[in-house]
Protein backbone atom coordinates (compact mmCIF):
# COMPACT_ATOMS: atom_id res chain seq x y z
CA UNK A 1 0.00 0.00 0.00
CA UNK A 2 1.01 3.62 -0.43
CA UNK A 3 1.62 5.72 2.67
CA UNK A 4 0.93 9.43 2.30
CA UNK A 5 3.93 11.58 3.19
CA UNK A 6 5.16 15.10 2.59
CA UNK A 7 5.95 16.54 -0.83
CA UNK A 8 9.00 15.16 -2.64
CA UNK A 9 10.48 13.06 0.16
CA UNK A 10 14.13 14.02 0.43
CA UNK A 11 15.47 11.49 2.91
CA UNK A 12 14.41 8.56 5.05
CA UNK A 13 16.07 7.33 8.23
CA UNK A 14 15.55 4.21 10.30
CA UNK A 15 15.09 4.59 14.02
CA UNK A 16 17.70 3.04 16.30
CA UNK A 17 15.34 0.18 17.15
CA UNK A 18 14.44 -0.46 13.52
CA UNK A 19 10.76 -0.11 14.33
CA UNK A 20 10.17 3.30 12.77
CA UNK A 21 10.98 4.85 9.45
CA UNK A 22 11.21 8.64 9.49
CA UNK A 23 10.77 10.49 6.21
CA UNK A 24 10.91 14.21 5.51
CA UNK A 25 9.55 15.95 2.45
CA UNK A 26 10.86 19.13 0.94
CA UNK A 27 7.76 20.76 2.45
CA UNK A 28 9.23 20.07 5.93
CA UNK A 29 6.60 17.46 6.77
CA UNK A 30 7.94 14.55 8.83
CA UNK A 31 6.16 11.22 8.88
CA UNK A 32 6.92 8.55 11.46
CA UNK A 33 5.95 5.17 10.01
CA UNK A 34 5.60 2.13 12.27
CA UNK A 35 7.07 -0.81 10.36
CA UNK A 36 6.00 -3.36 12.99
CA UNK A 37 2.29 -2.82 12.40
CA UNK A 38 0.54 -5.51 10.38
CA UNK A 39 0.11 -2.86 7.70
CA UNK A 40 2.83 -0.19 8.17
CA UNK A 41 1.34 3.27 8.54
CA UNK A 42 1.91 6.78 9.89
CA UNK A 43 1.78 7.00 13.68
CA UNK A 44 2.91 10.62 14.00
CA UNK A 45 3.55 13.59 11.76
CA UNK A 46 4.61 17.20 12.10
CA UNK A 47 5.63 20.07 9.87
CA UNK A 48 8.78 21.77 11.19
CA UNK A 49 8.94 24.67 8.74
CA UNK A 50 8.24 25.53 5.12
CA UNK A 51 11.16 23.73 3.48
CA UNK A 52 13.50 21.05 4.83
CA UNK A 53 15.90 18.27 3.89
CA UNK A 54 16.98 16.21 6.90
CA UNK A 55 15.62 14.10 9.76
CA UNK A 56 17.32 11.73 12.20
CA UNK A 57 16.78 9.95 15.53
CA UNK A 58 19.02 9.49 18.55
CA UNK A 59 21.19 6.38 18.31
CA UNK A 60 23.48 6.48 21.39
CA UNK A 61 23.05 3.63 23.90
CA UNK A 62 20.40 4.54 26.45
CA UNK A 63 18.96 7.23 24.18
CA UNK A 64 17.85 5.02 21.26
CA UNK A 65 14.80 6.66 19.63
CA UNK A 66 14.32 9.03 22.60
CA UNK A 67 14.72 12.07 20.37
CA UNK A 68 14.20 12.98 16.75
CA UNK A 69 15.71 16.01 15.04
CA UNK A 70 14.92 17.80 11.81
CA UNK A 71 16.70 20.66 10.12
CA UNK A 72 14.96 23.12 7.89
CA UNK A 73 15.93 25.46 5.09
CA UNK A 74 13.18 27.87 6.07
CA UNK A 75 13.04 29.01 8.70
CA UNK A 76 16.77 28.49 9.34
CA UNK A 77 16.61 26.19 12.35
CA UNK A 78 16.69 22.69 13.72
CA UNK A 79 13.97 21.17 15.88
CA UNK A 80 14.53 18.47 18.51
CA UNK A 81 11.41 16.42 19.16
CA UNK A 82 10.16 13.63 21.39
CA UNK A 83 11.05 10.44 19.53
CA UNK A 84 7.72 8.77 20.34
CA UNK A 85 5.33 11.58 19.43
CA UNK A 86 7.32 14.16 17.42
CA UNK A 87 6.27 16.77 19.97
CA UNK A 88 8.73 19.70 19.62
CA UNK A 89 11.03 20.06 22.63
CA UNK A 90 13.62 22.57 21.38
CA UNK A 91 13.76 24.90 18.39
CA UNK A 92 17.22 26.32 17.71
CA UNK A 93 17.95 28.98 15.08
CA UNK A 94 21.02 28.69 12.86
CA UNK A 95 21.51 32.34 11.88
CA UNK A 96 25.08 33.42 12.47
CA UNK A 97 28.52 34.25 11.17
CA UNK A 98 30.27 32.58 8.23
CA UNK A 99 33.49 30.76 9.05
CA UNK A 100 35.59 32.36 6.32
CA UNK A 101 34.73 36.08 6.20
CA UNK A 102 32.98 36.38 9.56
CA UNK A 103 29.96 37.94 7.86
CA UNK A 104 26.48 37.58 9.30
CA UNK A 105 24.26 35.21 7.32
CA UNK A 106 20.51 35.59 7.95
CA UNK A 107 19.32 32.36 6.30
CA UNK A 108 21.79 29.47 6.76
CA UNK A 109 20.10 26.20 5.84
CA UNK A 110 20.47 22.92 7.72
CA UNK A 111 21.60 20.43 5.11
CA UNK A 112 22.46 17.05 6.63
CA UNK A 113 22.04 15.56 10.09
CA UNK A 114 23.37 12.27 11.46
CA UNK A 115 23.33 10.76 14.94
CA UNK A 116 26.51 9.63 16.66
CA UNK A 117 26.62 6.05 17.89
CA UNK A 118 29.52 6.94 20.23
CA UNK A 119 28.15 9.98 22.09
CA UNK A 120 24.71 11.45 22.76
CA UNK A 121 25.16 13.89 19.87
CA UNK A 122 23.57 14.93 16.63
CA UNK A 123 25.94 16.13 13.90
CA UNK A 124 24.21 19.05 12.17
CA UNK A 125 25.67 20.53 8.98
CA UNK A 126 24.79 24.21 8.40
CA UNK A 127 25.33 25.00 4.75
CA UNK A 128 25.90 28.74 4.25
CA UNK A 129 27.88 29.45 7.42
CA UNK A 130 30.27 26.54 6.94
CA UNK A 131 29.61 25.11 10.37
CA UNK A 132 29.16 21.59 11.60
CA UNK A 133 27.42 21.54 14.97
CA UNK A 134 27.80 18.75 17.52
CA UNK A 135 24.56 18.99 19.48
CA UNK A 136 24.82 17.13 22.80
CA UNK A 137 21.30 16.02 23.75
CA UNK A 138 22.23 14.33 27.06
CA UNK A 139 20.51 17.22 28.87
CA UNK A 140 17.75 18.49 26.60
CA UNK A 141 17.08 21.42 28.92
CA UNK A 142 20.67 22.65 28.62
CA UNK A 143 21.91 21.73 25.14
CA UNK A 144 25.66 21.90 24.65
CA UNK A 145 26.67 22.76 21.10
CA UNK A 146 30.24 22.47 19.81
CA UNK A 147 30.84 24.37 16.56
CA UNK A 148 33.39 23.09 14.06
CA UNK A 149 34.36 25.38 11.20
CA UNK A 150 34.29 23.63 7.82
CA UNK A 151 33.96 24.75 4.22
CA UNK A 152 30.86 26.70 3.27
CA UNK A 153 28.08 25.14 1.18
CA UNK A 154 28.76 21.53 2.15
CA UNK A 155 25.45 19.80 1.64
CA UNK A 156 25.02 16.06 1.98
CA UNK A 157 26.78 13.92 4.52
CA UNK A 158 26.75 10.61 6.32
CA UNK A 159 28.75 8.30 8.53
CA UNK A 160 31.44 5.95 7.26
CA UNK A 161 31.07 2.17 7.64
CA UNK A 162 32.46 2.27 11.20
CA UNK A 163 29.85 4.92 12.14
CA UNK A 164 32.68 6.90 13.74
CA UNK A 165 33.52 9.46 11.05
CA UNK A 166 31.20 12.03 9.48
CA UNK A 167 31.82 12.70 5.81
CA UNK A 168 30.23 15.63 4.01
CA UNK A 169 30.54 17.04 0.49
Feature locations, PLM:
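Predominantly soluble domains enriched in secretory-pathway, periplasmic, or organellar proteins
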Residues: 1-169
